[in-house]
From Swiss-Prot:
A GO MF label: magnesium ion binding
Binding-site residues for FMN, renumbered to this chain: 66-69, 98, 126, 193, 223, 273-275, 294-295
Taxonomic source organism: Hydrogenovibrio crunogenus (strain DSM 25203 / XCL-2) (Thiomicrospira crunogena)
Subcellular location: Cytoplasm
GO biological-process terms attached to the record: isoprenoid biosynthetic process
Cofactor(s) this protein cannot do without: FMN; NADPH; Mg(2+)
Subunit structure: Homooctamer. Dimer of tetramers.
A cellular-component GO term for this protein: cytoplasm
Residues annotated for substrate binding in this entry: 9-10, 98-100, 161
Keyword Metal-binding applies: yes
Family: Belongs to the IPP isomerase type 2 family.
Descriptive protein name: Isopentenyl-diphosphate delta-isomerase
Length: 343
C-alpha cells in the first residue's frame, strides 16, 4: 500500500463498505413501484433486445459500472482492471472513482489506465466538482480524461460527504459558473453526478443553465457515504452527525420524478440503490437512459474478472426477463412508458 493519504482514504472506504452491513441502506424505494405483469406477453423471449447506445457506443443493455475506486495500490489497481475487463466482455459502460488521487500522487495513474482493457466501451473519468473551488481547473480535468482515454467526465457533487469527511472541502459557493466554464473548454461531455443523495429540480436547472446535458441522479438508498465517513472520523460529534444524515436525500425514484419535466432538455442516468435488473427496468420506465450499479460489483471485482462478468450477466438476465414479462421486447418500448406501472 502506498503511503499516500488519499490512497489510504480510498482503501478505508472499501474496508468500511465491506465491514458495516448498515452502510447499504436498502431503502431505495424501488419495492414500492409495481409493474404490470403480462400473462400473454405476445413476444418471443429469444428475440428480446435490451441493447442501447450511450456516448456513441453500443451497449448490450443499459448498464453503467458506476464509480468505485482508484489509487496507488495493487489492490485498487486490480479492482479497476477486473471491472474494465468485465465491461469490455459484457459490452457495458464503466466509470472510475475520483481521479484527484492521480493528480496528487502520480503513482496512482496506473489505476486509471484502463482503455487497454476496455477498448470499445464508454469510459467515464471522474473529478469532484468541489475541486473547482480549491485550485483544480481545465488542466487537471483534461489530464484525467486523457489518462483514462475517457468518453466523458463525471463532475461529482457530494456536499454531505464533504461536511462529514475529516478532510472535507465545503465551499460550494458559485460552483455552477465554474462548471459552465469547464464545460465550454473540455474535450468531452460533462455528466453532473450526485453520490447518493439525489439531484433536485433546482440542481438540474442549474446544470442546464451551465450547459450540462447529462445528469446522474444518484439517489439515496444504497451506499451511504455519510455513514462511511462517520466511521473514519475520530470526532465523536462528527460521527454522530454522519449517522444522523445517513438517510438524507431523495431516493432514485423520487429524483427521476423531479427530472421528468426536463426529459426534452437532458438525458438521465439512474443510480443509487439499484440492486437488480428489475430495479433497472423500473428506472428506464421512469426516464433513465442508463442505470449505474456499484456496490454489488465490488466483491466480485476484488475476486476476479470472471466473477464480475457473472454478476453483470445475472443483471442482464434479470433485465431481459422483466422486459419479456412486461411484453416489451425492445428497450425503446420501456422508456417513459407509464402504462407499465400499476396505478
Amino acid at each position: 500500500m502506498s503511503d499516500s493519504p488519499i490512497t489510504q482514504r480510498k482503501q478505508d472506504h472499501i474496508d468500511w463498505l465491506l465491514q458495516d452491513e448498515k452502510i447499504e441502506r436498502q431503502q431505495a424505494g424501488f419495492d414500492q413501484i409495481q409493474l404490470t405483469h403480462r400473462g400473454l406477453p405476445e413476444c418471443d423471449y429469444a428475440q428480446v433486445d435490451s441493447g442501447t447506445t450511450f456516448l456513441q457506443h453500443s451497449l448490450s443493455f443499459p448498464l453503467l459500472i458506476s464509480s468505485m475506486t482508484g489509487g496507488a495500490s495493487n489492490a485498487l489497481n486490480t479492482i479497476n482492471e477486473n471491472l474494465a475487463r468485465a465491461a469490455e466482455h459484457c459490452q457495458v459502460a464503466m466509470a472510475v472513482g475520483s481521479q484527484r488521487t492521480m493528480i496528487l500522487d502520480r503513482k496512482a495513474e496506473k489505476s486509471f489506465q484502463l482503455r487497454q482493457f476496455a477498448p470499445t466501451v464508454p469510459l467515464i473519468a471522474n473529478m469532484g466538482a468541489i475541486q473547482l473551488n480549491y485550485g483544480f481547473g481545465y488542466d487537471e480535468a483534461q489530464r484525467m480524461v486523457e489518462v483514462l482515454e475517457a468518453d466523458a467526465l463525471y463532475l461529482h457533487l457530494n456536499p454531505l460527504q464533504e461536511v462529514i469527511q475529516p478532510e472535507g472541502d465545503t465551499n460550494f459557493a458559485k460552483l455552477a459558473e465554474k462548471i459552465a466554464h469547464l464545460k465550454n473548454h473540455l474535450s468531452v461531455p460533462i455528466i453532473l453526478k450526485e453520490v447518493g443523495c439525489g439531484l433536485s429540480e433546482k440542481d438540474i436547472q442549474l446544470g442546464l443553465d451551465a450547459g450540462i446535458e447529462w445528469f446522474d441522479l444518484a439517489g439515496r438508498g444504497g451506499t451511504s457515504w455519510s455513514r462511511i465517513e462517520a466511521h473514519r472520523t475520530e470526532d465523536s460529534q462528527q460521527a454522530e452527525l454522519g449517522k444522523m444524515f445517513q438517510d438524507w436525500g431523495l431516493t432514485t425514484p423520487q429524483a427521476l420524478k423531479q427530472a421528468r419535466p426536463f426529459q426534452s432538455q437532458a438525458q438521465f442516468i439512474a443510480s443509487g440503490g439499484i440492486r437488480n435488473g428489475i430495479d433497472m427496468v423500473k428506472s428506464v420506465i421512469m426516464g433513465a437512459q442508463i442505470c449505474g450499479v456499484a456496490a454489488p460489483l465490488l466483491k466480485p471485482a476484488m475476486a476476479s474478472t470472471n466473477a464480475t462478468i457473472g454478476t453483470i450477466e445475472q443483471l442482464q438476465q434479470e433485465f431481459r426477463t422483466a422486459q419479456f414479462l412486461l411484453g416489451m421486447p425492445k428497450m425503446a418500448d420501456l422508456f417513459l412508458n407509464d402504462s407499465l406501472i400499476v396505478p
